[in-house]
Structures are given as structure tokens and as C-alpha cells.
A protein has these predicted regions:
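Membrane-cytosol interface motif
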Residues: 47-56
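Membrane-interfacial helix-loop connectors
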Residues: 63-94, 108-125, 207-285
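Transmembrane helical segments that form the transport core of multi-pass membrane transport proteins
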Residues: 32-44, 173, 177-251
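Hydrophobic transmembrane alpha-helices of multi-pass solute/ion transporters
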Residues: 1-19, 42-47, 141-181, 208-218
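Long, highly hydrophobic alpha-helical transmembrane signal-anchor segments
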Residues: 1-37, 100-123, 217-238
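Membrane-water interface at transmembrane helix exits
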Residues: 28-32, 76, 113, 142, ...
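Juxtamembrane and boundary regions of transmembrane helices in multi-pass small-molecule transporters
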Residues: 5, 17-29, 40-43, 80-81, ...
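Residue-level signal for the membrane-embedded core of alpha-helical transmembrane segments
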Residues: 18, 22, 31, 66-69, ...
Length: 316
């Protein structure tokens, strides 16, 4: 690899990730130091009460509408301080599916509409429904698995009056310095490994292997199956381009196009999620825990997409 390639494919993206992680860590520490978690948790209070979840989970849920990194950092800090158990951390991370989805919703709308036209509303609506299903499912799981929070104690662990800005900044900076070195030491080599595997064609080969062994897609027409293939071996927009061409040419009905896109989304995302999310997840959580969270998220995501797609297949 030349220096130019190393800079553009590894060094510069890694610097951006570490910069985002650093900013998110500072923001999360500052919010907690100022006791703003009390305010943020109020927006999701009915849901976290129903799910027997702690106040910091509600604060993280609200924060995830603006920054997924800051939301996860908030959960990691609470877990390290013993305020969240392993089980609560996993449920809290999965609970943030809906706000995390909303972070990407504008981009999804602006990308899908030019290709799919009115069919984009069905596709986006189905993926939104799947995200809502995931968060509501976690609320139900929390209600069954977690012990009830005493009435009136969603915010009771936080003091009424927070520290001054000077005190909060000092506390945030002190905690930031303790964690940032560890984050860099973990994130940098993992990101470098992901770039190396990608440059060696590992992920492309894995996606091609999956695409070549999709015998269960016999129920799809060859044209619809091509949408799935393009979405897997290339990028999401390649699948959209194929779908748009077939849709506007009258080659496929809307329903089959949408189902093909859903299937391509379901099959291609796990590998890409691991490739893109693991480096910064491992910087926020322990690497083993980071891998576990990504697996849980992808399993839940696949299950919710499958439920929504089956509902559309039989009822749409």
C-alpha cells in the first residue's frame, strides 16, 4: 500500500472516528456531570417505566436521536460505574434502535425516493415499522426480565441540583483523560485490521459466497433476485438502481421490488455493520462485549425486518 492509499483508506478515516469518539465521550461526561440525564430521561419516561429501566437508559434513548456515539458512551459509563448490569446494558443498547434509525432516516428518504418514487414510502415505512417493533419489543422484554423500578424513582438517583459549569467541565475532562488513551489503543488496531481485511477482499468474498448460496430465494423471480444480488455484492444504492430500472420499466410490480429490497437489506447489512461498527464499538465497550452487542443488534434487526416483510407479503 502506498502512503496515499494508507492516508485515505486508513489514517484519515481513523482520525475522524477517534475525533467523533472523543467528542462523544466529552459530551456524555458533561451531560452526566451537569445532571442533564434527569431532563433527557423525561422525554422517554413512559417507555422506560413500562420496561423497568433505569433513568440513564431513558437519557441515552433521548440522546440517541442526536448522537448514537454519545448515547452508547453514556451507557458504557453507567455500566462501568455499576449502575447498569450486563443485562440492562444489552437491553438499553437494543432499546436505542428507534432513535438510531431516525438519525439515518433523512438520508434514506433522499436516496430511495429518486429511484423508487412512491414505492419508497412503502419501503421506508416498513423499515421504520421494524425499528419501532424492535424498541417496543425491548420494552416488553424489560418488563418481563427486569425487576420493577420503585414508583417515583426513575430520576431518584440523581441529585436535585447539579454542579457548576466549572466543576462539571473539570470532572468531565478528568474522566475523559482516563478513558481516551484506552479507547485509542483499542480502536486503532481494530480499525487497521478491518481495513486490511477489506483490502484483501475478505468482506467482498464473504458477501459473494452468501450471494452464491441463496437457494432459498427460489420463490423470487430472476429479476427480483438480481436486486438482492446487486444490493449484496455492491452497495445499497446499486440495489436501488436495479430496483428503480425494473420498476419504472414495468418489469416488476411494486410489491416484489419492495420485498427484494427488504431481503437484500436483511442479508447484506450484518457483514457491513460488523465492518463499520466494530472499531468504534470496541472503543466504547470491551471488545468482547462490543462484538456481542453487534450480534444481538443484527439478530434483532433481522428478526424485525423478517416479521415486517412477512406481514407485507401475506397482507400487503
Amino acid at each position: 500500500m502506498t502512503m496515499h492509499t494508507i492516508w485515505h483508506s486508513m489514517a484519515w478515516p481513523l482520525l475522524k472516528i477517534l475525533g467523533s469518539l472523543s467528542l462523544s465521550l466529552l459530551v456524555a461526561n458533561l451531560i452526566e456531570a451537569l445532571n442533564w440525564t434527569r431532563l433527557l430521561s423525561r422525554f422517554s419516561r413512559p417507555l422506560i417505566r413500562a420496561g423497568h429501566m433505569q433513568d440513564v437508559v431513558g437519557a441515552s434513548f433521548s440522546m440517541a436521536f442526536f448522537s448514537g456515539l454519545a448515547a452508547n458512551t453514556m451507557l458504557s459509563e453507567a455500566h462501568q460505574q455499576g449502575r447498569l448490569t450486563d443485562r440492562e446494558l444489552v437491553l438499553a443498547n437494543l432499546f436505542n434502535s428507534l432513535p438510531t434509525y431516525f438519525l439515518h432516516l433523512p438520508t434514506m428518504i433522499f436516496v430511495t425516493v429518486p429511484f423508487l418514487g412512491t414505492a419508497a414510502a412503502i419501503y421506508v415505512g416498513m423499515t421504520l415499522g421494524a425499528a419501532m417493533l424492535r424498541s417496543l419489543g425491548i420494552v416488553l422484554a424489560g418488563r418481563v426480565i427486569l425487576p420493577p423500578i420503585p414508583e417515583g424513582c426513575v430520576e431518584c438517583q440523581l441529585p436535585e441540583k447539579g454542579p457548576t459549569w466549572r466543576e462539571a467541565l473539570h470532572k468531565s475532562w478528568r474522566r475523559f483523560k482516563k478513558r481516551i488513551a484506552k479507547i485509542c489503543l483499542i480502536t486503532a488496531p481494530i480499525y487497521a485490521a478491518m481495513v486490511a481485511l477489506n483490502s484483501w477482499g475478505f468482506f467482498t468474498a464473504a458477501e459473494k459466497f452468501i450471494a452464491d448460496h441463496l437457494s432459498f430465494m427460489d420463490w423470487l423471480s430472476p429479476k427480483a433476485a438480481s436486486i438482492v444480488m446487486f444490493g449484496m455484492v455492491a452497495e445499497f444504492t446499486a440495489g436501488l438502481a436495479a430496483a428503480g430500472a425494473l420498476l419504472h420499466g414495468g418489469e416488476l410490480p411494486v410489491k416484489e421490488v419492495v420485498l427484494a429490497l427488504m431481503l437484500g437489506n436483511l442479508l447484506s447489512t450484518p457483514m457491513r455493520a460488523f465492518r463499520h461498527q466494530f472499531p468504534y464499538y470496541a472503543g466504547i465497550f470491551r471488545p468482547a462485549l462490543a462484538a456481542k452487542l453487534i450480534v444481538y443488534n443484527q439478530v434483532l434487526r433481522a428478526a424485525s425486518l423478517l416479521v415486517v416483510a412477512l406481514g407485507y407479503y401475506f397482507l400487503g
